[in-house]
């Protein structure tokens, strides 16, 4: 079995935050808040939370807070539910939720919920299961789940439930690993997991493991290291992690590491990025790989954080 290149990954994480003299850094303004979450989670999972620059990160996140109560990806951009949940998750990790008006953020989120229970990503109206999950995740962290119309939210989530046991991004859409995570985790947070067939769901997820040990997002697709989180977390939520080959998946994930520069890629020998680094490490955490911080499969937050917040 390959080894986890811990020191390489720590150096990689420090390096990606200091590339301000590179054009690529500025071309990815739309990913800055997301990248902060992925980086902070990676530091936590590697048991190096003390190396997170808390003051710098909190200051930047506050510069992304808009008058509406939501967060933008970068100062001057529009707010969006995805940036809002990532910002709130980071503030929770850094024990800094007190710097925002929780009621105002919660009101912003509820303003995105539609009458049918779904949730818009922003004022422009795009609807997606990921957005509803993000709102539920965020409200739970803020202690404001009572703001949510839970009945309509659950009804809409169940409309995304498919005959094969999986979930799509909207009613009638094909089952997909990432949507399975968002819907299953949302139902778990809302204590409504009894509405689904866990045996059928476990079958659908276990079918995502392919030759070589990796997981894909849907049938006939290539494996990708990020599905070590998206597929595995709902399997953890329903208590069926033993339905996949643990050792083969670990070998696949470790095989996507860059032995020279650190970081994880989607597949072996591809370019690394902080997104795949975060979710590969989160997957290894669910697999109880040695010396990695335990993760909460509902929130993709360190278990220490969610336990402290009594989530």
From Swiss-Prot:
User: What does the entry's cofactor note say about binding and number?
Assistant: Binds 1 zinc ion per subunit.
Name the cofactor(s) required for activity, per the record: Zn(2+)
Binding of geranylgeranyl diphosphate occurs at 176-178, 218-230
What EC number(s) has UniProt assigned to this enzyme? 2.5.1.60
Which cellular components does GO assign to this protein?
Answer: cytosol; nucleus; Rab-protein geranylgeranyltransferase complex
Positions bound to Zn(2+): 224, 226, 276
Pfam families linked to this entry: Prenyltrans (PF00432)
Q: What class of enzyme is it?
A: transferase
In residue terms, where are the PFTB repeats? 54-95, 102-143, 150-191, 197-239, 246-288
Catalytic reaction(s) noted: geranylgeranyl diphosphate + L-cysteinyl-[protein] = S-geranylgeranyl-L-cysteinyl-[protein] + diphosphate
What are the protein's UniProt keywords? Metal-binding, Prenyltransferase, Repeat, Transferase, Zinc
Question: Could you state a single Gene Ontology molecular function term?
Answer: zinc ion binding
Keyword Hydrolase annotated: no
- One of the GO BP terms on file: protein geranylgeranylation
Matching entries from PANTHER family are given as: GERANYLGERANYL TRANSFERASE TYPE BETA SUBUNIT, GERANYLGERANYL TRANSFERASE TYPE-2 SUBUNIT BETA
| Subunit structure, as described in the record | Heterodimer of an alpha and a beta subunit.
Give the family this protein belongs to, as stated in its UniProt record.
Belongs to the protein prenyltransferase subunit beta family.
Functionally, this protein is described as follows: Catalyzes the transfer of a geranyl-geranyl moiety from geranyl-geranyl pyrophosphate to proteins having the C-terminal -XCC or -XCXC, where both cysteines may become modified.
Q: What is this protein called?
A: Geranylgeranyl transferase type-2 subunit beta
Q: Which organism is it from?
A: Schizosaccharomyces pombe (strain 972 / ATCC 24843) (Fission yeast)
Query: What broad taxonomic lineage does this protein's source fall under?
Result: Eukaryota, Fungi, Dikarya, Ascomycota, Taphrinomycotina
Task: Please state the gene responsible for encoding this protein.
Answer: ptb1
């Amino acid at each position: 079995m390959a080894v986890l290149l811990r020191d390489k990954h720590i150096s990689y994480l420090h390096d990606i935050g200091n590339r301000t003299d590179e054009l690529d850094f500025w071309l990815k303004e739309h990913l800055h808040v997301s990248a902060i979450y992925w980086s902070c989670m990676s530091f936590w999972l590697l048991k190096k939370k003390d190396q997170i620059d808390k003051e710098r990160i909190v200051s930047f996140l506050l510069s992304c807070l808009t008058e509406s109560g939501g967060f933008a990806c970068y100062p001057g951009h529009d707010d969006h539910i995805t940036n809002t949940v990532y910002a709130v998750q980071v503030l929770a990790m850094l024990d800094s939720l007190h710097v925002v008006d929780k009621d105002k953020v919660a009101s912003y989120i509820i303003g995105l919920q539609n009458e049918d229970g779904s949730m818009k990503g922003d004022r422009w109206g795009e609807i997606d299961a990921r957005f509803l999950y993000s709102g539920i995740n965020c409200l739970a962290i803020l202690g404001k789940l009572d703001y949510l119309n839970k009945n309509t939210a659950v009804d809409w989530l169940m409309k995304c439930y498919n005959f094969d046991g999986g979930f799509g991004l909207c009613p009638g859409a094909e089952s997909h690993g990432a949507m399975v995570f968002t819907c299953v985790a949302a139902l778990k947070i809302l204590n409504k997991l009894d509405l689904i067939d866990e045996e059928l769901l476990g079958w659908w997820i276990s079918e995502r493991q392919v030759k070589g040990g990796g997981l894909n997002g849907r049938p006939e697709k290539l494996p990708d290291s990020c599905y070590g989180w998206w597929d595995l977390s709902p399997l953890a939520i329903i208590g069926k992690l033993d339905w996949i080959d643990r050792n083969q998946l670990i070998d696949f994930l470790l095989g996507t590491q860059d032995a020279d520069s650190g970081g994880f890629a989607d597949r072996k020998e591809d370019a690394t990025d902080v997104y795949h680094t975060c979710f590969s490490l989160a997957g290894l955490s669910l697999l109880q790989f040695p010396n990695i911080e335990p993760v909460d499969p509902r929130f993709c937050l360190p278990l220490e954080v969610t336990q402290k917040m009594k989530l």
